[in-house]
Amino acid sequence: VAESYVERAPWPELASAVRTVWIQRTGETAYVQRHLPTGGVELHFPIGGRPQLVGPLTGPNVEVIAPRTTLVGVRFLPGMAPPLPTVLDDLVDERLDLEELWGDSAGRLAEAIAGAAGPETALDLVQGQLLRMFRSAGVDPLVREAAQLLMPWQPVEIGRLADRLAISTSQLRRRCLHTVGVGPKTLQRTLRFQGFLALAQAGATPSGRRGADGLAGLAVDVGYADQAHLSRECLRLTGLSPRTLLGGSMDQCGCGHDHAASYRPFLATRSRPPLRQEAARFVQAAPTRRT
């Protein structure tokens, strides 16, 4: 059995909360998986095993997946975690058994997944459970909008962002910590790096505004000062250099996995209106000052 990893878009009803879902199979030997910060949390459901939640990451998290394991997973957008009994800043860089957070419902879901006809059915069971949970749970629309406005394609200073959302910087930070797990500046840095990975995965052609090197061009396109700035951030977030992470290729990660489904909605935000228009629309929609 060969190792495989296949991403896809979530159910349309979950697209506002879930960035991607996937099915992963390991081969005859254990597989070393390097999880990177994405700004969101993840749920991992090894079929026949114990489901886990991976909290918001601020650096690389290395996991050894046992041989002959089949796993289905869900990656959430920033600020759009599934209903949990705690704030997300308590879960930063943590890996927890889902039963600790969801109680018996996690165990029942794990049993249903273990008895599923296959991983496709197991993934449907997970998405169905999430859909039921999100229908009865609320989200913080301000933080969701802040996360969109922190995308690298329209860089903004955090103080200006708070002003445009009609709250103080301390309020913005507190609400981000509770619902994203990290402050807005950390989220902005994470999303900028995700933007670089998205461009690399898509095989984007750099603008060439600085230097002839492809990495340097993409670095500037996504908001880094130069390639050295990108390299420092890549080492901090992944523990690897950009070239090592990409495996020497500009259109895939070093592990060979195709993450197009994960980055497709991310790249779509490049066509959003300028920040000034977005913030004005959001503030006009809020009749009172949020606290």
Predicted stretch roles:
Residues 1-169, 179-184, 198-225, 241-291:
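Alpha-helical bundle regulatory/interaction domains
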Residues 176, 188, 234, 246:
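DNA major-groove recognition helix of helix-turn-helix
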